[in-house]
């Protein structure tokens, strides 16, 4: 995408406790089963697709910063802009990784684990969904209604989550980017919800 770039690289956390290698999920008999964190051995990559003014750049900064300072991970973030005008397309990229694996690239995220779409109009742009695999997750902001036809381009095994971030933000006196980050942490528990809430405060 043409345009400028804002970068905010964060390195290894200093003085932070290492992130837990596993989380747990409930089982049918009421117990719990260990679930390996996706950042234990590799990078976990997120791409925020947005338009200027909706807070995607801030969301990326907060997420990467919280990962480094509060979760004991490595993290890096930068954004690219179609132009500096409000309402122009914005892409915000976040890479997270284990504390012992430095992040040495600032290349755009082309094969994301997660795509978060801040405005459903961006589904009309073919590159918005580019790179999402069958193991990936799409989170998109839209009111309740019929499924957008553009989602038919996704692999059938990809996870798709719709959230009416604007409605929730109004009801909770919050911001849509905070709602979308909360949705992200609900799906991926290694992004500790409490930690993100503290970072957003």
Cite the ranges covered by each PLM segment.
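Active-site cofactor/cluster-binding pocket
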Residues: 2-201
């Amino acid at each position: 995408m043409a345009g400028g770039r804002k970068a905010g690289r964060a390195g290894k956390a200093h003085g932070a406790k290492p992130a837990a290698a596993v989380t747990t999920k409930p089982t049918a008999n009421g117990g719990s089963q260990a679930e390996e964190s996706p950042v234990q051995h590799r990078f976990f990559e997120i791409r925020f697709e947005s338009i200027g003014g909706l807070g995607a750049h801030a969301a990326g900064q907060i997420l990467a910063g919280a990962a480094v300072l509060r979760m004991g991970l490595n993290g890096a973030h930068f954004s690219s802009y179609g132009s500096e005008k409000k309402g122009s397309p914005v892409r915000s990229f976040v890479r997270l990784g284990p504390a012992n694996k430095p992040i040495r690239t600032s290349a755009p995220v082309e094969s994301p684990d997660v795509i978060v779409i801040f405005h459903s109009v961006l589904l009309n742009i073919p590159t918005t969904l580019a790179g999402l695999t069958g193991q990936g997750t799409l989170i998109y902001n839209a009111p309740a209604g019929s499924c957008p036809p553009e989602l038919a381009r996704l692999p059938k095994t990809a996870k798709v989550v719709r959230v009416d971030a604007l409605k929730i933000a109004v009801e909770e006196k919050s911001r849509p980017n905070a709602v979308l980050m909360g949705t992200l942490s609900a799906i991926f528990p290694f992004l500790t919800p409490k930690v993100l809430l503290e970072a957003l405060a």
